[in-house]
Amino acid sequence: MQRIISERTAFRKYSDRILCAISLLVFAVSAQAEWRVVSTESELGHAGVEYQHVVVEDSVADQRAGLDVAIFSAKSCALRVIDNPDGEGLSAAMKREKCLCGVNGGYFDPDFKPIGLRISDTESSSQVRRARLITGILLQSQGGIDVIRASEFSRTRKIIAAIQAGPFLVEKSKSIRGLNDSQLARRTFVGIASNNRALLGVCSNVSLAGLANILSTVPFAADCKVRRAMNLDGGSSSAFWFARENGSAFSIPGLKPVRDFVGVISK
């Protein structure tokens, strides 16, 4: 009897070692997964805004994604949060507000009311909400453009524009751990980068973890490394717009009305 118990104990220990080894192998494969740039197309717009269409590939997961990104200087450009109570399309709003580029904004409830903090032209229409999903705030202050944690928000500085969304994707140029890596969807994102630059854009079907890895590793320019980034409303809400120098525009329309937009204007 004692021998049987000993054999069972030994088998359990052996099984545990096997499971541990498998887990480490899976982790190692995941850790080796890297997104690499397959192709890049770029175009300069007004006020130094640069549009890029970037195709990236994760050979380990056998997955490709396409990003449409606008990169701009926080010295020459500023953010605006544009209210959209009538459900207007992004293109019409961007043209009317004379924006250089823009994307859809934050989350909203079934009654079309914004969820979380929203400040437009220094006027606040909703307050900071503490929730697991909306952990980030994009803001424009007199000091420039920033992406901060919701817990870091303070009214001590004058905020010109702000929008709360999330989750956080990149911090200190590293992807956030624990993000969902299985649910693929269109994504909209914003970020701040080195050399006082900022970026906003959309990405084709990718998980939150995948997008975080892309933003933290893919070089959009030789001297442009993403320091912080957060997710905006995505899926059917995702939309992107860029004003070309010749007066035309490149546009990826959303599939449903959204409550607000994030636009970029020249200072």
List where the protein language model places each region.
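Bacterial N-terminal signal peptides that target proteins for export
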Residues: I5-L19
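Conserved, well-ordered active-site substructure
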Residues: F112-R132, N180-T188, I192-N231, S236-K267
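Bacterial N-terminal signal peptides
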Residues: L19-A28
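A short, polar/proline- and glycine-enriched secondary-structure boundary/capping micro-motif
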Residues: L90-A92, T156-A161, T188-F189, A209-I214
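Zymogen propeptides
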Residues: Q32-R129
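Active-site-adjacent helix-turn-beta-strand microarchitecture at beta-sheet edges
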Residues: F108-D181
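Flexible, D/E/H-enriched segments
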Residues: A33-V60, S175, R244-K267
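Short acidic-glycine loop/turn motifs at beta-strand connectors
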Residues: S73-K75, L139-G144, E171-K172, I192-N196, ...
